[in-house]
From Swiss-Prot:
Disruption phenotype: Spontaneous onset of obesity in 16-week old mice with higher levels of white and brown fat and a slightly heavier liver. Enhanced susceptibility to high fat diet-induced obesity characterized by a weight increase and higher levels of white and brown fat. It comes from Mus musculus. This is Intercellular adhesion molecule 1. Residues 1-27 form the signal peptide. One of its GO terms (cellular component) is extracellular exosome. A motif (Cell attachment site) lies at residues 151-153, 179-181.
Length: 537
């Protein structure tokens, strides 16, 4: 306990008050001082005096040790020592047959023997009430003693201690714990205020106690891992929880089948996670319990799940031969293992699942690079799992040189740009030559920038490989311009001009003839009209 205490210099005689009690000859008894204020265990001198004129017997009644220091005919001076608590010493006299007395008030002050903040809980949940308990032992006068509860330097509560100094007192105060209280120091301080008596304010402070708070979400840790584990694979097990505090104090771990696999945990500001990589082997039980456990403060949050371990081999897809010549027979077979069944084999009509499916085909050129697909299914824990296998067939066949691969007739205009396509195909890829029958000139396959008359002719294309050969004729016709053609080209426009002129002249002639006929008819009509109007002779 840390404490501060001053040694006060207190006047032992503070006041003089006389108590008068009538007696023979108006005798009076008095006590001095009437009030005294001193530290516990201290001493004070008390004077008892009387105005009695007759036979006088004077004394002091007290519970403390007393020594008579001096005396006179009608007074005595006593010293009281080791005064432990508040008391009222009494001066008394026997004056003749009359008794009288006077009392004083002694007030004792003392510092608390101990000030202690009761131990705090190991962990306090955020949002819950935290009761601080300050235990005060001793201290007087209690009317001037108070207890202060602190969070760091912040005053949370100040309360009077009260009660009898000999009785220990507990002062309580309730606060609502928050995240900000994590790591905060709480303490209790007593304050003995003797300033009204001309002294100072004396304080004792308890040892500080540190508080740890925690907060947990309403959810449980989240497991992110498949329910099914396949033998021969590596599976990632992951568990996490968000919204907790303080995440740095939390511990999270994974437990698989009662064993803790090698794992790595991560703590961030308000979340934690655990990750484990597990090699699934045949030694594993078919069902394994998986637990994710989070520990924070005195709380444990847990998530459980049951994992199923299975062994599922891919189906075995075989071809009797991966490479065959055209026309050969090929057997395609798919076999399932580990309790699985074949549900699909390309080339076979759908049928009920069975452990094995096969069929035979005659290989043709269309089957070259044909993919065969096989799928097997396995039911595990009510779920259907699928695995597939694919194989490719290679068929050897002779060269092909059809109309679509190489046109038989080509007609080009001399001087134009053309592209000639002629390509044989087969497996293995055939070689091909195209030569003109007349002189063996090569067929211009590809891009021809300027067609020439000399390219005209009949060409023979021959494609061959280790699996056969094929021949195809290609006719190339080149249209070109001769000198007679130029004469025709010149004469045609001239003739067209002459014909046009003749037609124009005929049109003008016919028009003039029609006009003359029209005028003649008009003249005849006018003559007949005049003749009808003449008077008879």
């Amino acid at each position: 306990m840390a404490s501060t205490r001053a040694k006060p210099t207190l006047p032992l005689l503070l006041a003089l008050v006389t108590v008068v009690i009538p007696g023979p000859g108006d005798a009076q008894v008095s006590i001095h001082p009437r009030e005294a204020f001193l530290p516990q265990g201290g001493s004070v001198q008390v004077n008892c005096s009387s105005s009695c004129k007759e036979d006088l017997s004077l004394g002091l009644e007290t519970q403390w040790l007393k020594d008579e220091l001096e005396s006179g005919p009608n007074w005595k001076l006593f010293e009281l020592s080791e005064i432990g608590e508040d008391s009222s010493p009494l001066c008394f006299e026997n004056c003749g047959t009359v008794q009288s007395s006077a009392s004083a008030t002694i007030t004792v002050y003392s510092f608390p023997e101990s000030v202690e903040l009761r131990p705090l809980p190991a962990w306090q949940q955020v949002g819950k009430d935290l009761t601080l308990r300050c235990h005060v032992d001793g201290g007087a006068p209690r009317t001037q003693l108070s207890a202060v509860l602190l969070r760091g330097e912040e005053i949370l509560s100040r309360q009077p201690v009260g009660g009898h100094p000999k009785d220990p007192k507990e002062i309580t105060f309730t606060v609502l714990a928050s995240r900000g209280d994590h790591g905060a120091n709480f303490s209790c301080r007593t304050e003995l205020d003797l300033r009204p008596q001309g002294l100072a304010l004396f304080s004792n402070v308890s040892e500080a106690r540190s508080l740890r708070t925690f907060d947990l979400p309403a959810t449980i840790p989240k497991l992110d891992t498949p329910d099914l584990l396949e033998v021969g694979t590596q599976q990632k097990l992951f568990c996490s929880l968000e919204g907790l505090f303080p995440a740095s104090e939390a511990r999270i771990y994974l437990e698989l089948g009662g064993q803790m696999p090698t794992q790595e945990s991560t703590n961030s500001s308000d979340s934690v996670s655990a990750t484990a990589l597990v090699e699934v082997t045949e030694e594993f039980d078919r069902t394994l319990p998986l637990r994710c456990v989070l520990e924070l403060a005195d709380q444990i949050l847990e998530t459980q799940r049951t994992l199923t371990v299975y062994n599922f081999s891919a189906p075995v897809l075989t071809l009797s031969q991966l490479e065959v010549s055209e026309g050969s027979q090929v057997t395609v077979k798919c076999e399932a293992h580990s309790g699985s069944k074949v549900v699909l084999l390309s080339g076979v009509e759908p049928r009920p699942p069975t452990p094995q499916v096969q069929f035979t085909l005659n290989a043709s050129s269309e089957d070259h690079k044909r993919s065969f697909f096989c799928s097997a299914a396995l039911e595990v824990a009510g779920k259907f799992l699928f695995k597939n296998q694919t194989l490719e067939l290679h068929v050897l066949y002779g060269p092909r040189l059809d109309e679509t691969d190489c046109l038989g007739n080509w007609t080009w205009q001399e001087g134009s740009q053309q592209t000639l396509k002629c390509q044989a195909w087969g497996n293995p890829s055939p070689k091909m030559t195209c030569r003109r029958k007349a002189d063996g000139a090569l067929l211009p396959i590809g891009v021809v920038k300027s067609v020439k008359q000399e390219m005209n002719g009949t060409y023979v294309c021959h494609a061959f490989s280790s699996h056969g050969n094929v021949t195809r004729n290609v006719y190339l016709t080149v249209l070109y311009h001769s000198q007679n053609n130029w004469t025709i080209i010149i004469l045609v426009p001239v003739l067209l001009v002459i014909v046009g002129l003749v037609m124009a002249a005929s049109y003008v002639y016919n028009r003039q003839r029609k006009i003359r006929i029209y005028k003649l008819q008009k003249a005849q009509e006018e003559a007949i009209k005049l003749k009808g109007q003449a008077p008879p002779p």
